[in-house]
C-alpha cells in the first residue's frame, strides 16, 4: 500500500471512531437532551414511576391549591393533564394559564412530585407542537393572562 493509501485508511478509521463515539454519547444523553416532556408524551411513553424528568405545559385554570408550603396544580397541554405536587416557594411568574416546567419524578399513582418549578414567561420555552395544539384548541394566551386577571388560588381547608 502506498503512503497516500495508508494515510486515507488512517483518516477514515479516525473519522469512524469519532462517529461511533458521538453516537454513543448522544445515545447515553438521550433523556437529558429533551428540555421537557408534555403531559401527552408522558402518557404515551408510559414513563416508569420514579423516573426523573421535566414536565412542561400550562398550569390548568382552577387547579392550583395551596396548603402551607405544599402546592398542588395540574399541568396540561390541551390533550392530557398531570397532577403536580410541589413543596417550596413558587416563582413570581407562576400563575394559572401560564407556562411552567416542573422537574421531579413520576409517582406510582400517575401524579408528579416536583423538586423545582420554573415559570415560563413566553412561548420560547415551549415546543412548537405544544404551542400549535394549544392555539388550535383556542387555549393559547399570548403572554398569559394579565396580572390580576388570573383565577384566584384556592386555599386548602385549615391553611
Swiss-Prot record:
Pfam families membership: CcmE
Gene3D superfamilies, alphabetized: Nucleic acid-binding proteins
Transmembrane intervals: 8-28
Source species, domain of life: Bacteria
KW Signal (keyword) present: no
Periplasmic side: 29-159
Membrane topology: Single-pass type II membrane protein
Subcellular location per the Swiss-Prot or TrEMBL entry: Cell inner membrane
Biological process, per Gene Ontology: cytochrome complex assembly
Residues annotated as binding heme: 121, 125
Positions in the Cytoplasmic compartment: 1-7
Signal peptide extent: none
UniProtKB keywords: Cell inner membrane, Cell membrane, Cytochrome c-type biogenesis, Heme, Iron, Membrane, Metal-binding, Signal-anchor, Transmembrane, Transmembrane helix
Primary site of residence: membrane
GO CC terms, sorted: plasma membrane
Gene Ontology terms for molecular function: heme binding; metal ion binding
Residue ranges, annotated region (Disordered): 134-159
Function of the molecule: Heme chaperone required for the biogenesis of c-type cytochromes. Transiently binds heme delivered by CcmC and transfers the heme to apo-cytochromes in a process facilitated by CcmF and CcmH.
Annotated family: Belongs to the CcmE/CycJ family.
HAMAP family: CcmE
Protein name in UniProt: Cytochrome c-type biogenesis protein CcmE
Lineage of source species: Bacteria, Pseudomonadati, Pseudomonadota, Alphaproteobacteria, Hyphomicrobiales
Amino acid at each position: 500500500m502506498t503512503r497516500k493509501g495508508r494515510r486515507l485508511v488512517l483518516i477514515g478509521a479516525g473519522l469512524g471512531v469519532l462517529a461511533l463515539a458521538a453516537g454513543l454519547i448522544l445515545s447515553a444523553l438521550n433523556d437529558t437532551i429533551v428540555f421537557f416532556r408534555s403531559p401527552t408524551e408522558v402518557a404515551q411513553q408510559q414513563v416508569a414511576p420514579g423516573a426523573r424528568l421535566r414536565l412542561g405545559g400550562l398550569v390548568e385554570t382552577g387547579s392550583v391549591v395551596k396548603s402551607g408550603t405544599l402546592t398542588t396544580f395540574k399541568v396540561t397541554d390541551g390533550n392530557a393533564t398531570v397532577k403536580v405536587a410541589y413543596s417550596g416557594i413558587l416563582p413570581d411568574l407562576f400563575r394559572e394559564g401560564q407556562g411552567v416546567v416542573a422537574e421531579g419524578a413520576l409517582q406510582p399513582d400517575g401524579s408528579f412530585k416536583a423538586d423545582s418549578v420554573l415559570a415560563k414567561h413566553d412561548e420560547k420555552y415551549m415546543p412548537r407542537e405544544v404551542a400549535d395544539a394549544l392555539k388550535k384548541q383556542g387555549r393559547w394566551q399570548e403572554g398569559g393572562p394579565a396580572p390580576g386577571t388570573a383565577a384566584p388560588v384556592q386555599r386548602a381547608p385549615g391553611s
